[in-house]
Regions:
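Beta-propeller domains
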Residues: 1-526
């Protein structure tokens, strides 16, 4: 296997036109923005973890059947400081940066003191968030960076803490039909409380307040939930929403705040301060968006680690929600760069395969129901919710599928009953090998794969005016040419006709230029 992990990627600052063989649907117009780690070595210093790398923004502009690609490193304060010093000087979650050994004792002492209550990185490498007409690169700290979606220039630095009291925030917000943003963050020991904060960013700013103001600066707290532990809040990567409720999992994968505060002095990374407790429970919080208060019943399930919520909706008095769950936290450990060697695909094995699980949570619990009775009356799932003697409810999921990650849906169905999931297939190795379309109703799937291809998170773009959830108009063509990828390519764009998963366009970029290939095939790899 060609070693690509840990190599610094070269920017493509000016748009380069891709060669298209075949045709792109005429209605597909716009710009796809991607974000992720691109630089893992600065001078002689190296990051420890794949998800520590400096953010590289990617842009695929599709206009009238043509594709243009460009990429640019996010000009964060972190990036600039590291490049100017020619070494890593800003700590990331898996890599602790230390002062220059040439500094005097007073400078070193100040560095140790400042890291006790750290100012986190603005290396926003996880996702892109849209707020009104603005676009932001995001990570899981309190910082986001505004970017120009056309040029990929880095603009304003925004600190969530100026508007809502959060030290950490997710990179997977939700959007309502009006374009308002709903997100979650953790507030650590604020006024004696550690809490999970749900906050809302309006899509537009009132006319009287528009001057010089962006929607983010009008963020407001929607609801807060007290952490079960003051100094060990739960880690979470995403959450779920229905039309009337928010779904939050307080899982036993936790941050130890005291250990984080002393990590710098102890010579360890912040990531080492996370731990999974197999003896603890996963608590399910259901928040009513109308009252802005949690449903009072205590719901819980077995210990698990969830990074991605898929979707949630209401049916017959229950909230049904789907997540990708693990039995432990081994996934994060596998992406330390020391483990990403040439034998990574063959030797790296998860101790828990990611499973698609459906939970059903009853919104109204009958006080007269017998202890041990199943409170779920929904016929579409085998998930159960068992009443216990103390009034708590133990939820057991229905396992829908084993071996998928990076789930996406037709977002028009977010918070509503839905049928299809588009994801990357992941078995015991953390490397995705196939793109998968899963049908929840029939429990069947369609798959696509190609040799030496690692598919990333898919994105569903519905047909304009589509009536069906998976409606895309393009159909296979027998006359389209095929050109293989360059051996050293590291960036690809695939365009698929989803009902059949039969048409793929791939854009590759390397030092020899960029190519887009549209491949139309008659058969699938099952």
């Amino acid at each position: 296997m060609e070693i690509i992990f840990g190599q610094n990627k070269i920017e493509q600052l000016e748009p380069v036109q891709a060669k298209v063989t075949g045709s792109i649907p005429a209605w597909l117009q716009g710009t796809l923005l991607r974000n992720g780690p691109g630089m893992h070595t600065v001078g002689e210093s190296k990051y420890n973890h794949w998800f520590d790398g400096l953010a590289l923004l990617h842009s695929f502009s599709i206009r009238d059947g043509e594709v243009f690609y460009r990429s640019k490193y996010l000009q964060s304060d972190t990036y600039i400081a590291n490049i100017e010093a020619n070494r890593i000087v800003v700590s990331e979650f898996g890599t602790m940066a230390y002062p220059d050994p040439c500094k005097n004792i007073f400078s070193k002492a100040f560095s140790y003191l400042s890291h006790t209550i750290p100012d986190f990185t603005d290396n926003c490498l996880i996702n892109i968030m849209k707020c009104g007409e603005d676009f932001y690169a995001t990570t899981e700290t309190n910082y986001i960076r505004k970017i120009d979606p056309q040029t990929l220039e880095t603009l304003e630095k925004v600190d969530y803490r100026k508007y809502v009291a959060v030290n950490l925030a997710t990179s997977h917000p939700h959007y309502d039909e009006a374009g308002n943003v709903l997100n979650m963050g953790t507030s650590v020991v604020d006024k004696g409380r550690t809490k999970y904060v749900i906050f809302k960013i309006p899509a537009t700013v009132p006319d009287s307040k528009k001057k010089g103001k962006s929607p983010v600066k009008h963020a407001e707290v929607f609801c807060s939930i007290s952490s079960r532990s003051l100094l060990s809040p739960s880690y979470y990567h995403s959450f779920g929403v229905t039309e009337n409720y928010v779904v939050f999992l307080e899982q036993p994968f936790k941050l130890d705040i005291l250990k984080m505060a002393t990590a710098y002095m102890r010579g360890v990374s912040w990531a080492s301060c996370m731990s999974f407790n197999r003896e603890d429970k996963t608590y399910i919080h259901i928040i009513d968006q109308r009252t802005r208060k949690p449903v009072p019943t205590k719901f819980y399930t077995d210990p698990m680690v969830v990074f991605h919520h898929v979707n949630a909706y209401e049916e017959d008095g229950c909230v049904l929600f789907d997540v990708i769950a693990y039995e432990d936290s081994s996934l994060y450990q596998l992406f330390y760069l020391a483990n990403l060697n040439k034998d990574f695909e063959e030797k790296s094995r998860l101790t828990s395969v990611p499973t698609l699980r459906r939970f059903a949570v009853p919104l109204h619990v009958d006080k007269d129901a017998e202890v041990g009775s199943n409170l779920v009356k929904v016929s579409s799932t085998t998930a159960t919710a068992l009443k216990e003697k103390d009034g708590h409810v133990y939820c057991q999921p229905e396992v829908l599928y084993e071996g998928l990650e990076l789930p996406r849906i037709n977002y028009a169905y977010n918070g509503k009953p839905y049928r299809y999931i588009f994801a990357a297939e992941v078995q015991w190795s953390p490397v995705p090998t196939k793109i998968l379309k899963y049908d929840i109703l029939t429990k069947s799937s369609l798959k696509w794969s190609e040799e030496s291809c690692w598919p990333a998170e898919p994105l569903f773009v519905p047909t304009p005016g589509a009536k069906d959830e998976d409606d895309v108009p393009c159909r296979p063509s027998r006359d389209c040419g095929v050109q293989g990828p360059h051996r050293k390519s590291h960036c690809q764009l695939s365009i698929a006709c989803v009902p059949e998963i039969s048409a793929f366009g791939r854009q590759t970029e390397d030092n020899q230029g960029s190519t887009v290939i549209l491949r139309y095939t008659e058969n699938l790899n099952y």
